[in-house]
A protein has these predicted regions:
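N-terminal secretory signal peptides that target proteins for export/translocation
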Residues: 1-10
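Acidic (Asp/Glu) and glycine-rich low-complexity loops/linkers
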Residues: 2, 28-138, 146-158, 165-177, ...
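Intrinsically disordered, low-complexity segments
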Residues: 12-14, 64, 222
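C-terminal motif of bacterial Sec signal peptides marking the signal peptidase cleavage site
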Residues: 23-27
Length: 287
């Protein structure tokens, strides 16, 4: 009888331990349900600041005067702040272990958009953003499928960040790309030009397709690369130094200088007499 009582006690203790473990496991189990948070907005959003390794989707919602945030991480990891004039900040805390989680941001933002992302954020947009757009990416962040029309665009990338499939239709384009960062243009159309300048530093890359009916300025140093055979240029100013490699297509003239092991391959240009090339560099015509 005593042995039977002892066995029953052992069974009850084992059952209690298993039950406690299951309760603890359920308590610790991550809630993967996509949650929503509505952020009241007074007027247009002009600036979006993203910090953290998010997969971010920014879509336009013209029927709502608020920003709707969707996410699948604990709410304690998120801080949002909206302040005038139109600045929305979204920050993630305790970033370890939540890489690849979802952050979707639906906003009414058709103009005056400024995006800043760092610490590995991956941003995708839908819709056409008008007027000016300034984009600042650092810490291996990404911006994908961005479309900007009817204004200027300024891109500043560092820390191996990337912009992929950018569409720009306007008259003022500036890009400052450093630390192995990359910009790829799906389409650029500039029929008139109040400014077009691309600067590459430290093995960065600029590529794409389209047409620029003016004279942009390409500046590159330290092994950077221009892959722009598919961008039809009217003319071009170049300043390359330190092993820069460039492929360009220009219908009129190319002028500027190549130095310290840089190489320029070009198509179509009718006049290259104003390009100075040092003894370590070369310029090659592609038929």
């Amino acid at each position: 009888m005593k042995n039977r009582t002892t066995q029953i006690k052992k069974i009850l203790i084992s059952f209690s331990i298993v039950t406690a473990f299951v309760v603890l496991l359920n308590a610790c189990k991550e809630d993967t349900t996509l949650k929503q948070q509505e952020i009241p907005i007074s007027g247009e959003i002009t600036r979006i600041y993203i910090e953290g390794p998010w997969d971010v989707i920014i879509t336009q919602d013209s029927t709502n005067n608020s920003a709707v945030l969707e996410y699948d991480v604990p709410e304690k990891n998120i801080k949002t702040e909206y302040s005038t004039p139109g600045i929305l900040r979204v920050k993630v805390y305790e970033m370890d272990g939540i890489e690849g989680k979802v952050l979707r941001l639906r906003i009414k933002a058709t103009a005056l958009l400024e995006i800043e992302a760092l610490d590995g954020a991956k941003i995708q947009t839908s819709g056409i953003f008008r007027s000016y757009s300034d984009v600042y990416l650092s810490g291996a962040s990404q911006l994908n499928e961005f479309w900007c029309e009817d204004g200027h665009i300024k891109l500043i990338l560092s820390g191996a960040s990337e912009i992929n499939n950018l569409t720009y239709i306007g008259s003022n384009f500036h890009a400052h790309i450093i630390d192995g960062s990359k910009v790829n243009l799906q389409n650029i159309q500039m029929s008139s030009c109040s400014g077009c300048q691309v600067k590459l530093f430290n093995r960065s890359e600029f590529s794409g397709s389209g047409r620029i009916s003016c004279t942009p300025s390409f500046f590159g140093v330290d092994g950077s690369v221009f892959k722009t055979f598919d961008i039809e240029l009217a003319s071009l100013d170049v300043d390359f130094s330190g092993g820069v490699f460039a492929e360009v297509t220009a219908s009129h003239e190319i002028k500027g200088k190549l130095s310290w092991g840089s190489k320029l391959k070009y198509k179509k240009a009718t006049n290259i007499s104003d390009v100075s090339v040092d003894e370590y560099s070369e310029i090659i015509k592609i038929e």
